[in-house]
């Protein structure tokens, strides 16, 4: 496994390694990128294993992107565990790209940015203004740097996945997006690097989010209103959890559905559990 921190090295390393592994039309010549912000956990391992299953050279990026953190958010305290991350990836990834912010943004944070459009201002975007512009900017840069054929993302960040897919389509980027299902703890809590912020009481309450989603899924036969009511009742019964948003969105447009909507959708939830903000989602079908 090669660990790289410098753009000059990574710009050609992944593709050069891929070509060396086989003919240009062989699976070994494929580059598969797994973008992360580090503080890796079993959910990330699942993404990397999926990347390995796709065949080719697996590149994992580790970069805490300042552009996607707003004022008052947790940029400074976001966990940085590079040594442990590299050890975890040994034997799984072929290349780890772990640049400093100055390497990614040599002109500073006022450099050219990608904008997420109208959907980028909804839900997570409304709660975290500018977040998705920053996320798309760094993902676009990583696509240009690593030149992947495939990029792997987790379904837990459903709005992120939607927006990355839109960017790829709108800008005609030659990248296929692969999505891996959310990995959960035994009690249903979605794995997240932010889970380590939870104290004992908050950790016990955090599973409320996945239970609320499960209650919503169970109520699908009653339509959108029944889904939202069932999920909201569960959340309101847990005083440690403060709801940010609970919404059903069309899987295709990521817009909030009408009360009489029928078809595939995502049930999204975001809440503060103690002092920690968590998100989750489930696929649903409204009959």
Curated annotation (Swiss-Prot):
Pathway: Cofactor biosynthesis; (R)-pantothenate biosynthesis; (R)-pantothenate from (R)-pantoate and beta-alanine: step 1/1. It is found in: Cytoplasm. Beta-alanine binds at residue 68. ATP binds at residues 37-44, 154-157, 183, 191-194. Keywords: ATP-binding, Cytoplasm, Ligase, Nucleotide-binding, Pantothenate biosynthesis. Disulfide bonds: none annotated. The keyword GTP-binding does not apply. The active site is at 44 (proton donor). Pfam families: Pantoate_ligase (PF02569). Its main location: cytoplasm. GO terms for cellular component: cytosol. (R)-pantoate binds at residues 68, 160. It is an enzyme of class 6 (ligase). The keyword Lipoprotein does not apply. GO terms for biological process: pantothenate biosynthetic process. It comes from the Bacteria. It catalyses: (R)-pantoate + beta-alanine + ATP = (R)-pantothenate + AMP + diphosphate + H(+). Belongs to the pantothenate synthetase family. Homodimer. NCBIfam families: cyt_tran_rel, panC. The reaction proceeds by a bi uni uni bi ping pong mechanism. This is Pantothenate synthetase. It comes from Leifsonia xyli subsp. xyli (strain CTCB07).
